């Protein structure tokens, strides 16, 4: 059940969203940028060998760890120079969505669910550095495959995160991988553990690797856990009683 504090924060946040904001347009821009990038990068690949393709799983694992790292140490920490990310995520996203009520009501709530479209541009720009290194020590094909993979993972991230915050449906409940990350992420929205557990938003591999998952099972079990709560650790922190004063949410908003 949604608290009065969460209700107040949601109402206040929604009032601040620009009248002309369009959730579908927001998503369209993200995927237009991402898919256009992948199309361009893919068209630079010619005669890739099997050794070139090995960079795809390597990039996937590196991106999974980066996703975990930036979520834990930037999005949940007030780091100088990145305060905008911290405020948007910890102080806004985690008040709008909690483990008591984690779903969106309309497409205007995409504003608090998706990153701004320019974030993808920044992410692809960051990928140029490792891609350049790959071109030197691997091949030019490997570099372009790396760019394709990082852009694809970003789009994967946005889609999975949306699925975490949609209303309950047979699709999100039964679709493998999506049902896993949905339970994983909703648990992360519990304020008692959000600073310590469940930082992955695609596949909980890094959470398993660095022991920051709320589950006690192997990596395959983590990835295909679904909604199963049988393996949730019993020694997790419990949520402390907090004020339900709506004004408290508005002050922090």
PLM features: residue spans?
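Alpha-helical transmembrane segments of integral membrane proteins
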Residues: 22, 26-30, 50-58, 144-148
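Short, flexible segments with low predicted structural confidence
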Residues: 33, 40-41, 45-47, 61, ...
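N-terminal signal-anchor transmembrane alpha helix
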Residues: 54-70
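Cytosolic-side membrane-entry/anchor segment at the start of a transmembrane helix
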Residues: 1-37
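Helix-coil boundary and interhelical linker segments in multi-pass alpha-helical membrane proteins
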Residues: 39-54, 132-145
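Hydrophobic core of alpha-helical transmembrane segments in multi-pass integral membrane proteins
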Residues: 24-42, 118-134
């Amino acid at each position: 059940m949604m608290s009065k504090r969460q209700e107040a924060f949601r109402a206040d946040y929604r009032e601040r969203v620009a009248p002309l904001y369009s959730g579908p347009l927001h998503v369209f821009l993200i995927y237009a940028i991402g898919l256009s990038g992948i199309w361009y990068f893919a068209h630079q690949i010619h005669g890739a060998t099997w050794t070139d393709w090995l960079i795809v799983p390597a990039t996937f694992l590196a991106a999974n760890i980066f996703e975990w790292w930036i979520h834990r140490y930037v999005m949940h920490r007030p780091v100088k120079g990145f305060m905008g990310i911290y405020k948007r995520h910890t102080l806004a996203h985690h008040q709008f969505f909690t483990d008591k009520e984690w779903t969106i009501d309309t497409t205007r709530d995409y504003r608090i669910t998706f990153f701004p479209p320019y974030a993808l541009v920044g992410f692809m720009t960051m990928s140029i550095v490792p891609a350049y290194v790959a071109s030197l020590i691997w091949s030019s094909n490997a570099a372009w495959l790396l760019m394709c993979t990082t852009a694809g993972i970003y789009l994967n991230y946005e889609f999975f995160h949306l699925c975490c915050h949609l209303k309950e449906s047979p699709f999100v409940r039964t679709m493998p991988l999506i049902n896993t990350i949905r339970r994983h992420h909703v648990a992360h929205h519990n304020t008692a553990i959000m600073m310590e557990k469940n930082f992955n938003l695609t596949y909980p591999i890094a959470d398993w690797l660095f022991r920051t998952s709320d589950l006690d099972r192997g990596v395959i079990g983590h990835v295909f856990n679904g909604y199963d709560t049988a393996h949730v650790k019993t020694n997790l922190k419990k949520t402390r009683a907090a004020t339900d004063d709506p004004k408290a949410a508005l002050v922090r908003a």
